[in-house]
Design a protein with these regions (language model features):
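Conserved catalytic core of nucleotide-sugar-dependent glycosyltransferases
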Residues: 157, 177-178, 192-268
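C-terminal catalytic/acceptor-binding lobe
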Residues: 30, 47-77, 99-107, 117-122, ...
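N-terminal signal-anchor transmembrane helix specifying type II single-pass membrane topology
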Residues: 3-82
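Short, acidic, metal-binding catalytic loop of nucleotide-sugar glycosyltransferases
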Residues: 101, 124-134
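Exposed low-complexity, polar/acidic, P/S/T/G-rich flexible segments that act as propeptides
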Residues: 510-528
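Short beta-strand/loop segment that forms part of the nucleotide-sugar
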Residues: 111, 131-144, 162-163
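Active-site nucleotide-sugar/metal-binding loop of Leloir-type enzymes
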Residues: 174-184
């Protein structure tokens, strides 16, 4: 990719500086003397015994003199410290800085059947995010009437309800989105807490025509390998992805999907189970992020037990619909593969603190076009074929998210060695108004750092190579890597350019070892 110089535009910055009022130090001896219990009695004695005044005065001065000498020698280095909480600490300048692009442009859609307590937890979590104008709960349970009284302790003004006269199952979330007043919608089920909302939304805003979903490593290996279906001869390029573990979608795509359900003459049961059709009918690979999910109570889960087989049956029916229309060139489904295609993408996982996204060009699975889709092969058989060709155990054990999960003892390990022009990096979600310090903990040879190019970007497309390179400080840690012998290295460097959003570290040569990234993080704490 060509490198284009761009001016270093800076955003307007408002800094609120909190000042603390410190008490003026008081001489300790003087303070003790003034507050002494004996002072009034001494003065009274001097007044009554005036004739002894001179002798007593000299005596007191003599005693005070030696007390001062003693105090100077013992307390000259002691200062009265302010209370512990008033001592200034090193504060990250980004502590309360968050992306604001797209604020108020999304509606969160939740479905209710029986887990009211879960919904309360989810609503409280979602209400804090500024991207949501409203949080809509579609109630499929006719025996329950949702109202403000049920959610009174949440105190979320964004909350809205629709009490459906009947159970519309999963198609209800798409109908609710079509009713929304915002251009984007967010879906999730009632048995998860999705912790990386800002990260997923920031990437979605870059490519809003693509469905963005969130899942764990196990399911990621399905939705990016075993559940991908390609046939270039008819322009089939679809992958199935769950939306229940978090998904941002455009309202336009949802409305198009509802139109497709009518044109393809889906039967009422298929219509009710719309989740099994939505991502496939887009005929685009969803942009999926991988991370560790946080579960809520999941009794009677829809996809447990026999539900898994039922889901695969509907997944297969969705593929038969789209395959038939693409084969006959009916024009119902999109045939152009949108940018970025699956192999043009490099955003992999959200950082644990929801302040960045991990980037790398290294894919974890073979080319999805290795197998041409055949309607006669069902989903379970397709899974077996893919697994026999390439197992996913390595990725599930060492997934992308381990590079940015805040834990030095976990690791993302690439399945292949580092090649020339391979890179890792971070999307910082919005242009940074401060200089930043980056830290890497890796299981690499020390020479790796001497063959890096560091690039920065404002938009993720036009890159600027830093020259000269910033000073890289490398420290050997006591912790060892996966072999139990090689010590991990901690590398830190500072980028003083401001207004940047993307950073990547590119290898200028091939190495005989794979990526082993234990941690990749950044902060905006001032340098000492």
């Amino acid at each position: 990719m060509s490198e284009k110089d761009r001016s270093n535009s800076r955003l307007p910055l408002h800094i609120n500086i909190r000042t603390e009022i410190f008490k003026t130090k008081t001489n300790s001896l003087r303070k003790i003397w003034q507050n002494s219990f004996y002072l009034p009695h001494i003065l009274k004695f001097l007044k009554i015994n005036a004739k002894f005044k001179r002798q007593i005065l000299f005596g007191i001065l003599f005693i005070v003199f030696w007390i001062c000498i003693y105090g100077i020698s013992h307390f000259s280095n002691v200062e009265e410290s302010p209370p512990q909480e008033m001592i200034p600490h090193e504060v990250d300048m980004l502590l309360n800085a968050f992306p604001t692009e797209g604020d108020g442009k999304a509606t969160a859609i939740l479905l209710n059947w029986s887990r009211i307590e879960n919904l309360k937890t989810i609503v409280k979590h979602l209400c804090q995010y500024t991207m949501f104008k409203e949080i809509m709960i579609w109630n499929n349970n006719g025996d329950v009437h949702l109202s403000d009284q049920i959610f009174s302790e949440i105190r979320c003004r964004k909350l809205r309800y629709y009490n459906s006269p009947g159970n519309m199952h999963f198609i209800a979330r798409y109908m609710a989105c079509a009713m929304a007043t915002t251009p984007y919608c967010y879906f999730q089920d009632d048995d998860w807490i999705i912790r990386h909302m800002r990260s997923m939304y920031a990437n979605f805003l870059r490519y809003p025509d693509l469905i963005h979903t969130d899942t764990n490593a196990d399911v990621y290996s399905l939705t990016n390998w075993k559940w991908c279906f390609f046939d270039d001869s008819i322009d089939l390029h679809a992958c199935f992805s769950w939306v229940g573990t978090g998904a941002f979608v455009s309202k336009e795509n949802v409305i198009n999907f509802l139109k497709m359900t009518s044109i393809t003459e889906m039967d009422p049961t298929e219509f009710a189970y719309g989740d099994m059709y939505f991502t496939t009918f887009m005929n685009q690979v969803p942009y999926q992020l991988e991370n560790e999910l946080q579960e809520l109570p999941q009794e009677n889960a829809f996809s447990a037990g026999e539900g898994r087989l039922r889901n695969k049956i509907f997944m297969h029916k969705a593929l038969l619909h789209i395959y038939d229309h693409l084969t006959n060139r009916t024009g119902v489904f999109e045939t152009k593969e949108l940018y970025p295609t699956i192999y043009q993408r490099d955003v992999r996982s959200p950082c644990e603190n929801d302040r960045c996204l991990f980037l790398t060009n290294k894919n974890s699975f073979p080319d999805v076009r290795t197998f041409r889709y055949k309607p006669s092969i069902n989903i379970s058989e397709s899974e077996r074929i893919h697994e026999s060709y390439f197992g996913t155990e390595h990725f599930i054990k060492y997934p992308y998210s381990h590079a940015v999960d805040g834990k030095n003892w976990t690791v993302w390990k690439s399945s292949e060695v580092i090649n020339k022009d391979d890179y890792i990096g971070l999307d910082l979600l919005f242009p940074m108004p401060f200089p930043l310090t980056f830290t890497l903990v890796v299981d690499h040879h020390r020479d790796y750092f001497s063959t890096l190019n560091i690039h920065i970007s404002y938009n993720g497309m036009d890159w600027i190579q830093l020259a000269p390179l910033p000073k890289i400080i490398i420290t050997q840690l006591s912790q060892t890597g996966l072999d139990g012998k090689t010590h991990l290295l901690s590398c830190s460097f500072r980028i003083r350019e401001t207004g940047i959003r993307f950073v990547k570290l590119t290898s200028t040569r091939e190495w005989e070892f794979p990526y082993g990234i234990h941690e990749f993080s950044f902060h905006a704490k001032p340098m000492n």
